[in-house]
Amino acid sequence: MERFLRLGGLGGNLGTFGANPQDSNQVDTSETVYISSLALLKMLKHGRAGVPMEVMGLMLGEFVDDYTVNVIDVFAMPQSGTGVSVEAVDPVFQAKMLDMLKQTGRPEMVVGWYHSHPGFGCWLSGVDINTQQSFEALSDRAVAVVVDPIQSVKGKVVIDAFRTINPQSMALNQEPRQTTSNLGHLQKPSIQALIHGLNRHYYSIPIAYRTHDLEQKMLLNLNKLSWMDAVSVENYSKCGEQNKEHLKAMLKLAKNYKKALEDEKNMTDQELAIKNVGKMDPKRHIADEVSKMLNDNIVQSLAGMMATTSLQ
């Protein structure tokens, strides 16, 4: 027993003077980037306005804790092109813009940058990686967001957030990141992103969207109609063209309905029950066209009468 104790003490002394391997701090995949509705709308609008060129801007927000990055607002940078280089970032414009935003009640700091990839997915090119490394030199947790305004449709925004991987950790065969939480959702990487160095030179960060009551009211009021829209008078020539289109559609549907009535005479009860399955019902479409034409003409007539009466 004393022999084992001596061996244990010797091992402890060797451990004290030797270099024990220690666990390094790996990147945590539970870190999430929360983008506000205002910032997302601004990025999409800026990216759509710059098509087919790439555009760039800076993101304002705060680092809440080790696992949360809030992006509250964004502003555009005055350049566009096929690539965004480090030299293209104008520090004078950035400083002036931040000063003006502070005067309007935006004291947030720069948490990263965004740029658009119109039509070719979300990934970082070599120039983008150099730009992101320049941002990470100022802040280790800076985030690069890539948005595709061409592939983005209503209900599905093509967007992703990235951060570069330290090449020293890759040289030591360390993991680029370590999954420590089941929170968040990583998008399935595309083949283009894997070809351009995803999980080798940079890694993806989950993105979430958090809206409060004021943002929900703002989004609901975007396409909200007012009472003026109901009484507005359209161009009479345009209204006449629409009536012609309605009449042509009704004539075509009437012919189809007449043909359908002739075909029903030779059908059995089972065939009549399934005759409109997977097909257009001309009778119902005629009723829809008539209802739409009547509503448009009634509203146009009433709006014209109100305008004439009020101006007399």
From Swiss-Prot:
Any idea which UniProt keywords this protein has?
Hydrolase, Metal-binding, Metalloprotease, Protease, Proteasome, Ubl conjugation pathway, Zinc
**Domain MPN stretches:** 33-168
Q: To which species is this protein native?
A: Caenorhabditis elegans
Single GO BP term: proteasome-mediated ubiquitin-dependent protein catabolic process
Could you state a single Gene Ontology molecular function term?
metal-dependent deubiquitinase activity
Q: Which GO terms describe its cellular component?
A: nucleus; proteasome regulatory particle; proteasome regulatory particle, lid subcomplex
Q: Which SMART domains match?
A: JAB_MPN
UniProt enzyme class: hydrolase
Q: Please, which domain of life does this record's source organism belong to?
A: Eukaryota
Query: What's the encoding gene here?
Result: rpn-11
The family line of this record is: Belongs to the peptidase M67A family. PSMD14 subfamily.
The record places the motif (JAMM motif) at 115-128
| EC number in record | 3.4.19.-
Its protein name is: 26S proteasome non-ATPase regulatory subunit 14
